[in-house]
């Protein structure tokens, strides 16, 4: 069993998928597999995956479209790793040690099932290229105290952030496919209901691509 399954639910974003895979290839932590589940109607993502030459990559072309959340779950179903690391196709690791830092959080805190970090919000244009505008975002001390004392305060706001900013232990519940919005928040709440312990770093281990093409920012 590998330590980490990097799960990439992809849909029609070859530019983003290529950038993400390139960021994975240079990671200093190498005990991982990459699972790409492709919900695209064409072969553009598959072509990128085939030429990327990423070690330990598993490519799955969905025979029937799963939809956004269904594709998240499909990627996790194919995962064999001890830890699940969702990475959306708009996002990428900020530097070569970021996957190692994610793993360290759970390795050093066996009592926790969930860990999350800050993020670098990077503006993208209509075709997925960086515009040059970016800023870092992380949970505030006030909000960290709130959800540490009561995870139900996530009802007020998504203080954890995008799924790409998280890592969790295999065996977590699936994402709720009946929802269109706040899918990630609802998932975090069910995960913390089972085990309210979590680990956090305010450092931006991931860069989140922000564009008008996203389902949510």
Model regions and ranges:
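N-proximal low-complexity "stem/linker" segments adjacent to membrane-targeting elements
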Residues: 1-23
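Cell-envelope/extracellular polymer assembly enzymes that use nucleotide-activated donors
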Residues: 2-5, 33, 186
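Short, acidic, metal-binding catalytic loop of nucleotide-sugar glycosyltransferases
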Residues: 22-31
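A conserved acidic beta->alpha catalytic loop
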Residues: 30, 38-46, 64, 88
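Glycine-rich, basic loop-to-helix element that forms the pyrophosphate-binding segment
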Residues: 62-79, 92
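Short aromatic/hydrophobic "clamp" motif used to bind/position activated sugar donors
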Residues: 84
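Conserved donor NDP-sugar-binding/catalytic core segment of glycosyltransferases
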Residues: 97-132
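Conserved nucleotide-sugar donor-binding catalytic segment
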Residues: 117, 139-217
